[in-house]
Amino acid sequence: MTGLTGDITVGAALPPISKQFTLEMFKSDIATIHNDQAAAEAEGLPGPIAVGPQVAALIFRMAREAFGAGWIEGGKTSLTFRRPIPCDALCTAKGTVTGKKQEGEGTRVTCDVWVETADGEKTIVGTASGLVSGK
């Protein structure tokens, strides 16, 4: 079920989604930049970093909750990863409606979306859109 309808206004905020990442989430039998201090330092990083697609999944979850089936059946994204995220970061996906237009029997709602860390730094930025009922 979708939380948004076609009468959503430009400038409206999507409900944010937060997740506390931990090093344990990225553990495996192989030492990588995502789970091992020495491997991360060997690549010039200060420490292990989160797996980018796993962090971006916060945006996908936020969009699914906002658009419901309109995300599954017609969702679109374009994302840019701006910097590595420490593996122990608290990250929050946020979004703002930037436009809407009629598409078929519904409305395509376009949003600016991003993931930010607890200090407010945007680490992933982009756009997402989905279909909602109504005009």
Roles of regions detected by a PLM:
Residues 35-36, 42-44, 77, 86, ...:
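Short, surface-exposed, polar/charged, turn-prone segments marking secondary-structure boundaries
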Residues 1-72:
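Hot-dog-fold acyl-thioester-processing enzymes
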Residues 20, 80, 129-131:
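Residues in well-ordered beta-strands of folded domains
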Residues 1-13, 86-135:
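HotDog/MaoC-like acyl-thioester-processing domains
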Residues 1-2, 76-80:
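Short alpha-helix capping/helix-loop boundary micro-motifs
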Residues 27, 75, 104-105:
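Sparse recognition of residues in long alpha-helices and their boundaries
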